[in-house]
């Protein structure tokens, strides 16, 4: 009997949490907002979370973050620059494991193969980049950087990471990056400043993307650059309107 009562109480807590989440979103009063399904495990408390992806987006950008999911459910992400929010997305209800359940979808808009992709996670709960509140972030790197990019500007070579698997992201294809694969490293960085369970927001930015042949695109500057002949580690910027392919073939934002 005691077990039945305990199970009943747990069931009521889960139902109440789901109802509260839907009511909260329903009362938000913002046109276009939609209720995101609750992502919570039994016995874990729900909380309001937010996720943003970087702006601006130009028609010459090599890649675009096309989708974010939490627990397999797509969320309405806001827009941000670094750790600063530009326009809010739809808040959603999830448990303390929410960041582990995030997946980032990145699409290659160019006509070249991407061999290394980097995205940066910033945590506004820790700092927004203002005076006295520096940002804290973690860079997720997928694939292997080209040989040319493994040199510092003084000519010394970085130690390659043999644990990284090769990446070959073809034109028009989308890469799914599960944050769960990097959650232990992310947690270690975050907990130097704040208990991990207190993270409620994440801003996701495009970093460096490397192509076959050594060309690079930087999400922070939106510039392409190519290796300088005879100077390992050095790159030459291309024109601001350079794009490898047809910029209208793949949309800049879905």
Model-derived regions: residue spans:
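N-terminal secretory signal peptides that target proteins for export/translocation
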Residues: 1-10
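Short acidic/polar inter-strand loop motif in beta-rich domains
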Residues: 210-219
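Short, surface-exposed ligand- or partner-binding patches at beta-edge/loop junctions that are enriched
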Residues: 187-211
């Amino acid at each position: 009997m005691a077990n039945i009562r305990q199970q009943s109480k747990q069931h009521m807590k889960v139902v109440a949490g789901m109802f509260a989440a839907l009511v909260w979103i329903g009362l938000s009063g913002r046109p276009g907002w939609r209720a995101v399904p609750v992502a919570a495990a039994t016995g874990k408390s729900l909380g309001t979370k937010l996720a943003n992806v970087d702006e601006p987006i130009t028609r010459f950008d090599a890649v675009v973050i096309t989708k974010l999911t939490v627990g397999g459910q797509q969320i309405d992400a806001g827009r941000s620059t670094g750790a600063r929010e530009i326009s809010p997305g739809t808040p959603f209800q999830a448990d303390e494991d929410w960041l582990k359940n995030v997946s980032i979808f990145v699409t290659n808009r160019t006509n070249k193969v991407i061999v290394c992709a980097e995205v940066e996670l910033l945590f506004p709960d820790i700092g927004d980049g203002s005076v006295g509140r520096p940002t804290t972030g973690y860079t997720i790197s997928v694939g292997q950087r080209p040989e040319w990019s493994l040199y510092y500007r003084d000519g010394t070579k970085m130690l390659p990471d043999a644990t990284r698997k090769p990446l070959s992201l073809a034109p028009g294809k989308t890469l799914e990056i599960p944050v769960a694969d990097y959650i232990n490293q992310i947690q270690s960085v975050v907990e130097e400043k704040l208990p991990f369970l207190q993270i409620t927001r994440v801003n996701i930015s495009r970093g460096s993307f490397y192509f076959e042949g050594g060309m690079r695109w930087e999400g922070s500057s939106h510039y392409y650059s190519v290796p300088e002949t005879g100077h390992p580690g050095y790159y030459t910027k291309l024109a601001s309107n350079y794009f490898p392919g047809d910029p209208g073939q793949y949309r800049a934002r879905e």
